[in-house]
Amino acid sequence: MQIVDPAKIAKKYLQRLKESVTRLETNMQVVGFIASDDPPSISYANATRRVFTDAGFNYDLRHVKRLELEAEIIKANADKDVHGIFIYFPVFGNQEDDYLRNLVHYTKDIEAGSLYWTRKLDTNDRSATDIDANKKALIPCTPLAIVKV
């Protein structure tokens, strides 16, 4: 049995991502929302920020109160300069998290965790939209990572 080195696999994909971001005509702005003071969550958020930044994204990690997160997501959805939204879960640890996950507009849902994207995974719908069949649907990151490994 072969031992898989996830860091080696990730390096290949991160390099491709960095090259793609470099070719874009706009600076990609991603906003990450964390509504927790939990040290491991903050550590993960900071590590994620480093990866996004290293890949060439402008990454704005925002610490918000969990009762203000809904309004912040709505503002980020409406902000034409924000291209992607990342939320660090759990926030409430209940169905409210599902609501927040689905509040992110599908065009900014870089985690592909909303029903828009997970439904496409469930139905094997590989197109991002009905309008442009050439744009691939996003796959939530954990299932995608399993497939890639």
Where are the language model's segments positioned?
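Positively charged, low-complexity intrinsically disordered leader regions
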Residues: 1-26
